[in-house]
Amino acid sequence: MKNLSIFMFVFSLCMFGHVSRARIRIANELKFKKNLWMRCYSKDDVLGPHIIPIGGHFLDYFGTNFWGTTRFMCTLRQGPNYIHYQSFTAFKLFSMEDHGGLWDWRAREDGIYLKKEGNKFIKNPVNMHKVYDWIN
């Protein structure tokens, strides 16, 4: 019984050590005073919908799961009529060793850009680059 208690204690420390704080940031860098509509969801959570004013941003901190399968999908729409839109995977882990980091999305007139920041535990960090075009 004592060995089981020690095992459970060590196992729980490992589990708590792995659960990390990941972040999604969505910034409105559109021109012509356009607002940005956003809504994101995962298996367990729904973020939004929110209207992000020009120059503003939305930031959410969340824990990743132990199995390394945390995903967030987002839909962005350009104001004022919200005709131009894009739906995409805004966050995903690449393995159980990946801790997520900051996925920094920027909505611009010509598309949606991503910069992924992190430390040595972040898989595949990337500099700011265009990932998606707007759909009409």
UniProtKB/Swiss-Prot annotation:
Q: Which InterPro entries match?
A: Self-incomp_S1
Q: Signal peptide: which range, if any?
A: 1-22
Q: What is this protein called?
A: S-protein homolog 17
Gene designation per UniProt: SPH17
Family recorded in the similarity comment: Belongs to the plant self-incompatibility (S1) protein family.
Q: Major place of localization?
A: secreted
Q: Which UniProt keywords apply?
A: Secreted, Self-incompatibility, Signal, Translation regulation
Record localization:
Secreted
A Pfam family cross-referenced in the UniProt record is Self-incomp_S1
Which organism's genome codes for this protein? Arabidopsis thaliana (Mouse-ear cress)
Kindly list the biological process annotations in GO that this record carries. Answer: regulation of translation; rejection of self pollen
An example GO CC term for this entry is: extracellular region
